[in-house]
Amino acid sequence: MSSPPPDGLGVRRATVDDAPAIDELITAADVAVQGWSESSVPELLGWWRMMDLEHSSWVLHDEESILAYAAGFAHGDNFELDGFVHPDHQGRGLGAWLLARGEDRAGELRKPRLQTFSLAADDRAHRLFEQFGMRQLRRYYRMMIELEEAPLPARLPDGLELETFDPGEAKAFHDALIEAFEDEWNFVAMPFDQWRELRLVQDPDFDPTLWFVVRDGEEIAAVMRNEPDRSGAGFVGALGVRKPWRKRGIALALLQHAFGEFYRRGKRRVALGVDAENPTGATRLYERAGMQVAFEAVAYGKELR
């Protein structure tokens, strides 16, 4: 924290105990831009499990409350920073100070690129990023569907079988997931041991009955990882089909199966995130399944060397 914060504010690292207050900050920032937020304490804690808060987080505060916050993590060649300023305290240079700290941390980790995100509707954030020398890289959609009635049963192509995930086959699931996503923009494969610890051990919401595998004989053709609840909605965390099995309706069948399972559990809304320029045409698939764009986010990046 080499540079003092603006206006004599205090600065410290985030801790798990800060989660409720920081969630309130994020919610206020989202609501100011788009009128609603899907932030929650469990989701925030999930992100923090991937971060080194002791070295890669910053909390700006006065004597009464947290005014701004950012945290990040190394992701391939990027240092990815996620930051928020309370709408009542914008225009004080807090966001620029946090970006500078993210750039400093990227240098410490020898990462050649700083990357961050904002809601597509947040013009103030876009101006800040551009003034900081960043450029727009990619757009992402949060897509949702409201389930007004029980979905029709999913139908897979002949010869394929849908199974519930067996934690004893986690390595095969992980391998199939990596292969399915290897061509995605900004994708970095997480080592299996780290992935297993994060998803199967540390995650309090891990529910193997919401993870699915499509098999073609002994081969895994597709995998799906779902979360039981994110801000009141069932959430599709990952859906991947290996290349030899694409264009056969498997992804749509998996999605419909997940819709049905969420509906059976009382969830009437299902959401997911997707790269708007996904090379496999996932956005069109989700639209065919009845999903619509709820909001857009934008990725910005800055080359540091």
What is the predicted function of each stretch?
Residues V16-A19, E24-L109, Q115-A120, D216-G217, ...:
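Conserved donor-binding loop and adjoining core beta-sheet/short helix segment
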Residues M1-P5, F73-E80, V85-L160, V298-K302:
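Acyl-donor-binding surface of acyltransferase catalytic domains
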